Amino acid sequence: MPFGNDPPDYVHLRSNESQMQLITISENSDIPTPSGSPCFNAPARDEAPSVIFIPGKKFQGTFRWWKSRTTMEKLLLPVLLLFCLLTAVLLAVIINTDKRIEAMKTDHATQTEHAGFGDPTENPTKTAEDPRVPPIVPEAPTSPEPEVTTSTEKPKEPEVCSTPGCVRAATHFLNAMNTSVDPCDDFFEFACGQWNDQHPIPDDMYGFGTFAYAREQVRQQLRVLLEQEVVTESESINMARATYRSCMNKTQLDELMTGPLFETLTELGEWPLLQENWDKTKFNFTSLLVNSRRDYGVDVFFQLYIYADSKNTSRNTLFIDQSTLALGRGTRDYYLNTTLFSSHMTAYRKYLRQIAHLLKTDGNLTRSESEMNADIEKIIDFEIELAKIIVAEDERRNNTRLYNKRQIQDLYNLLPQVDWVPFFQSIAPSDLTHLFHNETEIIICEIEYLQHVSELIEKTDVGLLTNYVLWRVVQSNVRYLDERFEDIKQDFLKVMTGQQQSPPRWKDCAQVPSTVLPLAAGAIYVQAHFQESDKHEALRMIMHLRNSFADLVRQNDWMDEETKAVAIEKANSMINNIGYPDVTNDLPKLDKQYLGLSISDSDTYYYIMKKSVVWMQSREFQKLTKPFDKHEFDISPAVVNAFYSPEKNAITFPAGILQPPFFSGTFPKAVNYGAIGAVIGHEITHGFDDQGSQYDKDGNLHNWWSESSLNSFDTRRRCIVEQYGNYTVPKTNFRVNGKLTQGENIADNGGVKEAFQAYQKYVTENGEEPRLPGLQQYTNEQIFFVSYAHFWCGKKKEAAAMQQVLTDEHSPEVFRVIGVLSNMQAFADVYKCPRNAPVNPDHKCIVW
């Protein structure tokens, strides 16, 4: 599942997927996600980054390293060297100091050993005048009240790390932490307060955080690589650069204006909304749906997928699921609560009207504005009726309920308005039409939905049906036109997400190749920005995290031994995809991935995207002739995210997320385990959350739990639902949807616990690490938790925060920190939190 949140869906070109991801990938981005079963979870979405880092030329050796440092790092390194020198001098002085002064120091240490966290007057190292000086945090005991030592022997000063990696990690944290806050009261503010204060949300974004920073860095790097004037031996890489250039060709877009879209409308039989005398006698419902799906990838009234049969993952099969709405998946509340969301629906109405008016003007059409507006009202009213029959996402977590194997002939009874066999034969490649007949198997996710949508279609005028279908096609394709449509969309986004202005065009265009040619774009990125040593280090961490999960299973007292053994076997069977697929290093094999797709600099942007849709769909249908490939690494390496696929039982960590500030081979292990280690643990735990637990080690949907263990799991799961359901989201009056977010919350909780235990085991086997410079008063176990929280630093506009509550299966970032740590006794021990402190409640929810 995803690891974050995002705005509604305003673009159609994406693959469908069942993967659980670290953060939600925005549906209005161009980053693709692996194809998958529609029944499992919402399609991945991607959060819009902001401008942070602009990469320049590469440098070699020490000069390259120094030039790549930030200003803060350059300033901190000389300070660090001076600190080391002064420390050596100080030690020499201490050795020769009078014993009377030594005893006096010992007495003072005894008096201040129990100094409180939040009282600066009792802590001589922290003053009210300098709140940025970190407080002395007592080193972690195993008991909340450590025994007071009376030894007169001076404690040994902790070793401090001075490597570039330590300096860089320390800089990240020093620039983020608000150490005037007691970590036991609000650890999110403690770890992120300064970062959030010093990083306003850019006008071209609805939210900004450390995750968005990483996304933006990758996007900037891709931009530089795609703009290189080079021709390579790889045709697919050349096509990736040609796609970027066509997207950036504003001159051509301005010349074409709405011409390409009018060609589309003509192909589909004209849009009644724009026509004076639309001929309803030419209406053919099946043909309308065929042309929309086959040529433009737009599903209306139902969604069609090809993926592994959930109960026999050796084979691929057809899936049909309920529709999405124009505002995106999970947005039904916007339509159903028109009082609360009146401003949003007003913005949507205006958005539709402005697009229609622009098309009318460009086409020199004569239909009156009043008639057009009347049709627009009917479109919105119809979509409200459609929203009423769509099943809410938080009611779609029982995957067995969603698995209904039928035959195509059964669809004629459920939705008879569609002539199903010709429909499938028409959208499939011509060499595969023989696969579709009355007895062809298909898995239906929502049977009652199809019955209800049939009733809605039956009572709706054919003109309105055509208006709605073509509106969905228009909405999906206006982004490939000139910037007038971007201006219209931006006015809409200002209300829906709080985003104040459109991003520069290159930001969107840099992501387009990752949609059309994800592996080719990823190959460009990996060659320039990913080290093989990091791949090996990530693999070692995965092994450690997997062992840590197995230890948690063995240690728990609520599963029987047989179920424990099956759970551990499933964890040990997980497939690891790290960094990039091997094909990205083999250019001839890479080019074979894109046989049948031809893109050149002479192609218009609109035509490239249309060709890509047709090619993608043909490739998807070909999967029906092949076994399901559980080892397919079908995600662009340039994606900043992580994934778990239940049908593959596979975890995937693209190169894009294996980057600072979340991971580096030069970072201390405490930093890596707290950040990317928690991500790895998160994805492993997805195999054992409320949905992943329904699948076995081979990816098949069947119950492998004993009744008693399943009942115990359900009790613990409900605890998580209730805990998060009681959190009120900042800037809104809404509470977190504990039911919708439970899978991600279970994964967060398990992931951090696994990562912490894995780090503790590392220390046991390898010894304590030196501490971070400037933060040496914090133990490395304390830094582990700072590193985890730092992953989620950031904030959102009010509208975006509201949208997240309604549509996203992830909790807001603050609760991904507070919610997890409130359930970890180890955190309370490390920070010596008193009983019933805000981040150390007596009642804790523990699944894994």
Curated annotation (Swiss-Prot):
GO cellular component terms listed in the entry, alphabetical order: plasma membrane
Membrane-spanning residues: 75-95
Domain of life: Eukaryota
Family matches, as InterPro entries: MetalloPept_cat_dom_sf, Peptidase_M13, Peptidase_M13_C, Peptidase_M13_dom_2, Peptidase_M13_N
Residues modified by glycosylation: N178, N249, N284, N312, N337, N364, N398, N438, N726
Top EC class, one word: hydrolase
PANTHER family in the record: NEPRILYSIN-11 (PTHR11733:SF239), ZINC METALLOPROTEASE FAMILY M13 NEPRILYSIN-RELATED (PTHR11733)
Protein name: Neprilysin-11
Organism: Caenorhabditis elegans
Gene transcribed to yield this protein: nep-11
